[in-house]
């Protein structure tokens, strides 16, 4: 449990440090984005804590990924999208998306 807490605080502090450096170099009016991946409930850091330090949340939406027998159920995709919107309580960007298992052994769900 202590390791989880340490990791959470460390990731947040590192993100804050990076944002501060970028703002100093690029200017306070620059927009800082972080591209969050899925699997947020399995991660050992709080996405919303990191989101406090950036301007825009971005998300990689992969409803189908290689080796799956079937796509991620729509309600799980919706949960991920809701979670990203809630991280800053504002709209977010989809910066990567895949609608089929491109380059993997199972294709053609959608």
Task: Please name every model-derived segment.
Residues 9-106:
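Glycoside hydrolase catalytic-domain groove-lining segments
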Residues 109-110:
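Short, electropositive alpha-helical surface patch
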Residues 1-5:
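Aromatic- and acidic-residue-enriched carbohydrate-binding clefts of CAZyme catalytic domains
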């Amino acid at each position: 449990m202590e390791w989880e807490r340490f990791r959470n605080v460390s990731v947040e502090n590192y993100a804050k440090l990076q944002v501060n450096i970028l703002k100093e170099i690029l200017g306070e009016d620059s927009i800082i984005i972080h591209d969050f991946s899925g699997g947020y409930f399995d991660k050992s850091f709080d996405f919303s804590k990191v989101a406090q330090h950036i301007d825009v949340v971005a998300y990689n939406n992969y409803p189908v990924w290689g080796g799956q027998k079937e796509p991620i159920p729509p309600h799980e995709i919706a949960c991920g999208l809701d979670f990203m919107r809630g991280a800053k309580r504002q709209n977010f960007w989809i910066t990567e998306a895949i609608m089929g298992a491109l380059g993997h052994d199972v294709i053609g769900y959608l």
